[in-house]
């Protein structure tokens, strides 16, 4: 099993979710609003004629746990749906998951994901 963590632009979330809706390769998703700074180093905004620097930029973090054989498919959907080619598009991280246990039934491993 793998943990896919994607950090994307907030305006790309609908496209990512629409892409993921067309697959049965995952059963659950966690979506979090976050703030972050990367290569972009913040943005300059104006309010009432005054300019100010925003060091932390709003992003969305998506977490999914998937079977090993579904990692490439899910990663491609997220990548294709969220890429604009501009700085600040985000990142996708993939981690190994030792085990998963469904609390309700006690099922573990891949059985806990379905």
State where each predicted segment sits.
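Positively charged, small/polar-rich N-terminal and surface patches that mediate targeting and assembly
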Residues: 1-114
